[in-house]
Amino acid sequence: MPTINQLVRQGRKKSVKKTNTPALKGCPQKRGVCVRVYTTTPKKPNSALRKVARVRLTNGIEVTSYIPGIGHNLQEHSVVMIRGGRVKDLPGVRYHVIRGTLDTLGVSDRRQGRSKYGAKKPSK
């Protein structure tokens, strides 16, 4: 416990929160170009082929981002929008591609949770 005199001399240190998405530089989303689109396998208890893309952002930083949903149309040189949000079983993947914006198509035949996958409302 510091004395009053110690607090007067030095004050309290502000604890600085480390950001989980440093490449976004405080922005909610960023645009980028796909450098490589590939699949990778998740960590130990899980098994799958997760679709990911290496994206070079407009600020020059290159990040790995996850492509959510079933099926995608992304390839090299596709322009995508990314947001923050990690994938727990893929180490080093801290960003998500936003479906339904720029070159990324929304998920077709999606009925629930459509807004997260850029899917239009199905006609009756």
Swiss-Prot record:
The keyword tRNA-binding applies. Belongs to the universal ribosomal protein uS12 family. HAMAP family: Ribosomal_uS12_B (MF_00403_B). The modification 3-methylthioaspartic acid is found at D89. GO terms for cellular component: small ribosomal subunit. With S4 and S5 plays an important role in translational accuracy. Interacts with and stabilizes bases of the 16S rRNA that are involved in tRNA selection in the A site and with the mRNA backbone. Located at the interface of the 30S and 50S subunits, it traverses the body of the 30S subunit contacting proteins on the other side and probably holding the rRNA structure together. The combined cluster of proteins S8, S12 and S17 appears to hold together the shoulder and platform of the 30S subunit. Keywords: Methylation, Ribonucleoprotein, Ribosomal protein, RNA-binding, rRNA-binding, tRNA-binding. GO terms for biological process: translation. It holds the Pfam family Ribosom_S12_S23. Residues 1-24 are annotated as: Disordered. This is Small ribosomal subunit protein uS12. SUPFAM superfamilies: Nucleic acid-binding proteins. Part of the 30S ribosomal subunit. Contacts proteins S8 and S17. May interact with IF1 in the 30S initiation complex.
